[in-house]
Amino acid sequence: MRVRGVNIKVLTCWHFIRERYFMTTQEKQKKLSLRPLSPRDPEQPHRAATPLELLFDLIFVVAIAIAGQQLHHAIIENHLWHALPSYLMVFFALWWAWMNFSWFASAYDNDDALYRCLTFVQIVGSLVMAAGIPDVFHSQDFDIIIVGYVIMRLALVTQWLRAAKHDPERRITAYRYAVGIVLVQIGWLVANFAHALSIPLFLLLVVVELFVPIYAEKYSPTPWHPHHIVERYALLTIIVLGESIVGSFNAIRDALAAQSINIPA
């Protein structure tokens, strides 16, 4: 009996091995050259997550782990209700940046050199976000995490502008995404560096962030791949559950270390 998940992993490994060891120099140059960022076929068979997408997820593990550790420390110190809003704010930034990358990749990933470079810019942005997470919990300082978030989002704007150039049918959709994302990033920067970022304003900007895809997709929906999206969400869910398990383990370990347990003979 063939298991679909196993087949996907085998295909992904095969594509990686073929690219690393069996592709000719001419094939590699063609793969890395700039190509039109045309829409992908939403019914493409056997489409799986690419090695670049898996690397992107791996980097996000770092940020999610740091956020989980900070929440864990707050729980140990009986500061749960103080730290929980910070955790939810950080997690939204991580989740929303990841989700926008994944849906765009599902619709337009052409794996050329510029696409890879812009993806690595987003990876750098996620690392900057990860570096700023402790400051959010310790002093409500969002400077670093917002800079990292804006880096990721502006790299995605560049991708949308490429899509607008090469996909005439959805050009207005792509422009709506690009303009909407830029405007919201201006809002984040102004609100934070003017020291006006409160929870109500944060929630307002979140609503605007969520509204951008709704507004953009009304003109002409992007051709995302259903099975590819399902796999991408499954991978992120596994990551989040894994971090929850690690957090539970740390809590149990600290509880056991804080008191001795005597077992009668």
Predicted regions and their residues:
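Acidic, Ala/Val/Gly-enriched low-complexity intrinsically disordered segments
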Residues: 3-6, 10, 19
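Multi-pass alpha-helical transmembrane bundle typical of ion/small-solute transporters
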Residues: 14-17, 24-265
